[in-house]
């Protein structure tokens, strides 16, 4: 019967069949050897040896426990659940001796299907009025007759109405019979005491037909071992065949046996009918029965819901009871053969299930392949990068002073899915934040898909693949490019930067996000673990992993993407010159990003990121800038000696304490060039949880440098590429101006309409040679101070370096993005002329005070007006209140026509003020008496747009 029980999987049924057959045969053959030998060789006799038996007594002999080794274990494994059998400690009443007692309670303990699956056997545990307990097994037909008779004897119970179908069990489907039978059984379990005391009930449960007697089949088998009485959680026997536990047994003396001990229980059996509740029944068909205890531990509810949902999708949820006992894993691994075992399934259902399960298996296989092989990413072009200057395995060289040049061949995918985050999306009007909202909404699914692509590659000594993975997420995942060095250089060797051959450029110009992975291979000096970081940076790259080995090694990861803001790294610990930091400028334009290295901040083309500055002073260096598809321009920078963890990530809530503690002792400064922030995403998205918390703990001097860029220029050669930041150093910094320098060469073609189509032809060779400098500096030598370039003068009108006569402002980012924004702060009204969404695509520079937690941006106009907190103060907009961020004469967020004067104290006259809450003019939203609107409802924005003041330029 167990072989047909729907509660068991195919494998469980097979194991059960084998085990039970062995037990049955061993019981029949080796019965005379006492309790310990009852297992027939499978269980060794315990310390007590053969247990005493007394064939004449009707009471149980005192318990002497003998551990049974393998029978119970195998059965327990077959059932995949542990349970606790407590019933053996209860007084067992010999069958047939119930003349003076009545039934107190009936518990249903299990249903067993016979081979034809038509009849069901029910096992009951009966508590008698003298506190004895017996176990009775009856067939469903007997139970049906009993309940129908009981309904005649006790007409007031309305049993016939309760179970109208029990009279003709064969005229209904098995499922229907089970339902009806269960209704009757439930009634028996909850029957009132006067019904249970009825003579008919007493006779029914005190008599037993020979095939269902619970006594031992022959007097020559006096002691029957209890198999599988394992103490567990549920208080139920797992594998006692007719094992019926009792809930009243907690007071009994047998509860002290340990969780994994199996007890072999001697039973005094008598031919007259004394028997143990745990004795195996002799089946007419000789197939052993297993009774499922009612509290058999079922799989987790969520797994159950998973199966149910899965079946619902196929419109097969009515068959859910068939698979109820399976886990999701087992359910999905069912084969056609297994499905054929379920006789209650129709042919159509089996066929449908078979097809869907095969599809599911293919999907999971594909997923496994994806997670094990980094090159198998759905809809991705794969590029193989071969190191050209190495013949053997690529290993970190001890004394080699050259960097191997990498050749990249990109095989673009057959079809590129239209994806958000492509350059065409960013070339739209910079004043439309609608795209930001869409990107933000899809970023959750993006993180899901990214997590799937999170691949951990362990570099081994034998392998030397260098892979470039062009990742094209269809759901606006934050695609990234990661470059890891193929070689380590010791501190004495100068670092050379070789550009990638231009084959990469055609790919890069329209492949947009690229994921590059150059696996670093371990050598005896220790290598680096290569991680293909999922760009949902929720899995922190732990630098301890990268620094387990003894020798200096360098793993540099550049996670490049669109909308990447740039951070200068912290240099290594104080004994070393702090100027050895890498300043990586990962630009938004895929055509020509630039990277600057070293204290002198030489500009290097982004194609050379395969060779980054690696010195002994910087054992691990990682730059990662995740894509703006989540709405945040960001750069993640790890620079640390082995004990240090530093992570600055836009999509990760960074640990401020860790970052703060590690940044200050390292004498490092972090500067962020404002011109590279994506203006549409810097302020308004929920994912702008830019956790630059380390920056807030590092004193940063004014950022000097010149930015000049026009939004219609696509060629990087037209921009000054040598503007760097000369940072004021910390007091403990040995060489002030040698702190990490920043290359600020924004490629504004990222924002131009032609950014998506800007071709590598725009990068002249002269521009490339102009970008690349080889920097040779011996570590012992004191760092040479970089000459401070002209101040960071940015024209607030056109973005030029100040030649048009407008005033500019120097910038100091002291507390840059200290706290993440709260809530989904997407502004969905593109008709407001908010300057950070305009202004040639650049967020103008600004000075941030010590307490400012958010960046505020200057208006593109130089009018003497002050910020009206258009975005602040109301809970309707989850944007930080901008009034708190005034620092000196720094302009705060200024919107045209809605602002006052720069001293930050007075507002414009109220005639031009407009309340975005009620739509009226003359007061601000902070003073509005109307209840604030629900920002999530579409179409409720009631703004009466006030025309811009005459003093401002009317072209914007």
From Swiss-Prot:
Composition-biased stretches (Polar residues): 369-389
Residue stretches of biased makeup (Gly residues): 29-43
Keyword match Protease: no
Compositionally biased spans, kind Low complexity: 206-225, 246-265, 423-432, 750-768
Keyword Metal-binding assigned: yes
Keywords of the record: Metal-binding, Zinc, Zinc-finger
One annotated GO molecular function: zinc ion binding
Region (Disordered) residue spans: 25-50, 78-99, 206-229, 243-276, 361-464, 485-505, 543-583, 750-786
Zinc fingers typed CCHC-type, residue spans: 913-930
Positions with biased composition (Basic and acidic residues): 438-464
PANTHER family from the UniProt entry: ZINC FINGER CCHC DOMAIN CONTAINING PROTEIN (PTHR16195), ZINC FINGER CCHC DOMAIN-CONTAINING PROTEIN 14 (PTHR16195:SF16)
Protein name stated in the entry: Zinc finger CCHC domain-containing protein 14
Lineage of origin: Eukaryota, Metazoa, Chordata, Craniata, Vertebrata
């Amino acid at each position: 019967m167990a072989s047909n029980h729907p509660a068991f999987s195919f494998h469980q049924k097979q194991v059960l069949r084998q085990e039970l057959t062995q037990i049955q045969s061993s019981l029949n053959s080796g019965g005379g050897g006492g309790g310990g030998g009852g297992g027939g060789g499978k269980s060794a006799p315990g310390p007590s040896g053969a247990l005493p038996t007394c064939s004449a007594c009707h009471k149980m002999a005192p318990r002497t426990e003998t551990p049974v080794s393998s029978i119970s274990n195998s059965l327990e494994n077959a059932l995949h659940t542990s349970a606790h059998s407590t019933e053996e400690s209860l007084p067992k009443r010999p069958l047939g001796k119930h003349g003076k007692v009545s039934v107190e309670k009936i518990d249903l303990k299990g249903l067993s299907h016979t081979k034809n699956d038509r009849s069901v056997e029910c096992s009951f545990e009966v508590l008698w009025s003298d506190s004895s307990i017996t176990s009775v097994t009856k067939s469903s037909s007997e139970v049906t007759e009993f309940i129908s008779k009981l309904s005649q004897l006790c007409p007031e119970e309305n049993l016939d109405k309760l179970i109208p179908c029990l009279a003709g069990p064969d005229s209904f489907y098995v499922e229907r019979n089970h339902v009806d039978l269960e209704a009757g059984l439930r009634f028996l379990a909850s029957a009132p005491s006067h019904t249970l005391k009825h003579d008919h009930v007493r006779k029914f449960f005190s008599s037993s037909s020979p095939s269902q007697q619970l006594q031992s089949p022959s007097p020559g088998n006096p002691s029957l071992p209890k198999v599988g009485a394992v103490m567990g959680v549920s208080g139920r026997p797992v594998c006692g065949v007719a094992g019926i536990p009792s809930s009243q047994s907690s007071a009994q003396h047998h509860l002290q046996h340990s969780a994994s001990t199996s007890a072999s229980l001697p039973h005094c059996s008598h031919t007259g009918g004394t028997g143990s509740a745990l004795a195996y029944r002799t089946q007419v068909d000789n197939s052993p029965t297993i009774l499922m205890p009612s509290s058999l531990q079922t799989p987790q509810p969520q797994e159950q819901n998973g199966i149910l949902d899965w079946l619902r999708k196929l419109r097969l949820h009515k068959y859910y009871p068939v698979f109820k006992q399976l886990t999701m894993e087992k359910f999905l691994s069912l084969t056609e053969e297994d499905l054929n075992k379920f006789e209650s399934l129709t042919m159509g259902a089996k066929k449908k299930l078979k097809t869907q399960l095969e599809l599911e298996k293919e999907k999971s296989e594909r997923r496994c392949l994806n997670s094990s092989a980094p090159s198998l990413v759905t809809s991705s072009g794969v590029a193989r990068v071969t190191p050209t200057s190495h013949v053997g395995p690529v290993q970190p060289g001890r004394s080699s002073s050259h960097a191997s040049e990498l050749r990249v061949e990109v095989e673009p995918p057959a079809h590129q899915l239209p994806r958000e985050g492509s350059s065409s999306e960013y070339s739209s009007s910079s004043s439309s934040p609608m795209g930001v909202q869409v990107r933000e909404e899809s970023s959750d699914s993006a993180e899901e898909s990214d997590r799937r692509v999170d691949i951990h590659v362990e570099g081994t000594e034998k392998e030397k693949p260098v892979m470039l993975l062009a990742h094209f997420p269809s759901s606006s995942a934050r695609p990234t490019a990661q470059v890891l060095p193929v070689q380590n250089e010791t501190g004495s060797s100068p670092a050379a930067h070789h550009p990638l051959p231009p084959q990469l450029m055609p790919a890069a110009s329209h492949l947009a996000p690229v994921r590059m992975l150059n696996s670093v291979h371990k050598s005896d000096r220790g290598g680096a673990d290569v991680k293909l970081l999922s760009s949902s940076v929720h899995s922190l790259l732990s630098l301890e992993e990268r620094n387990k080995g003894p020798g200096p090694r360098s793993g540099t990861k550049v996670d490049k993407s669109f909308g990447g803001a740039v951070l200068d790294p912290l240099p290594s610990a104080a004994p070393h010159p702090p100027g050895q930091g890498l300043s990586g400028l990962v630009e938004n334009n895929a055509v020509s990003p630039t990277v600057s290295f070293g204290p002198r901040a030489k500009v290097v083309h982004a194609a050379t990121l395969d060779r980054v500055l690696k010195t002994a002073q910087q054992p691990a260096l990682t730059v990662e800038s995740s894509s703006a598809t989540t709405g945040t321009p960001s750069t993640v920078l790890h620079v640390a000696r082995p004990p240090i963890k530093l992570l600055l990530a836009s999509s990760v809530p960074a640990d401020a304490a860790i970052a703060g503690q590690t940044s200050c002792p390292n004498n490092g400064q972090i500067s962020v060039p404002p011109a590279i922030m994506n203006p549409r995403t810097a302020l308004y998205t929920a994912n702008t949880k830019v956790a630059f918390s380390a920056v807030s703990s590092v004193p940063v001097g004014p950022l000097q440098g010149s930015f000049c860029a026009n939004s219609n220029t696509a060629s990087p050669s037209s921009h000054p590429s040598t503007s760097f930041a000369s940072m004021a150093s910390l007091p403990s910094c040995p060489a002030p101006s040698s702190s990490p320098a920043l290359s600020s060469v924004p490629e504004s073609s990222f924002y131009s309409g032609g950014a998506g189509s800007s071709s590598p032809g725009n990068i002249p060779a002269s521009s490339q040679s102009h970008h690349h400098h080889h920097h040779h500096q011996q570590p012992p030598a004191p760092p040479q101070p970089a000459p401070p370039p002209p101040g960071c003068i940015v024209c607030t009108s056109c973005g030029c370096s100040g030649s048009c006569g407008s005033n500019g402002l120097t910038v100091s980012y002291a507390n840059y993005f200290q706290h993440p924004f709260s809530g989904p702060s997407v502004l969905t009204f593109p008709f407001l002329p908010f300057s950070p969404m305009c202004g040639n695509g650049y967020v103008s520079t600004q000075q941030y005070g010590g307490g400012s937690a958010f960046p505020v941006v200057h208006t593109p106009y130089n009018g003497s007006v002050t910020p009206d907190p258009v975005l602040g103060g109301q809970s309707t907009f989850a944007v930080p209140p901008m009034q708190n961020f005034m620092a000196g004469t720094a302009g705060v967020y200024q919107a045209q026509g809605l602002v006052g004067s720069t001293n930050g104290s007075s507002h414009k006259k109220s005639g031009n003020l407009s309340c975005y809450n009620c739509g009226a003019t003359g007061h601000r939203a902070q003073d509005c008496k109307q209840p604030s609107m629900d920002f999530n409802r579409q179409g409720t924005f009631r703004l009466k747009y006030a025309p811009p003041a005459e003093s401002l330029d009317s072209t914007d």
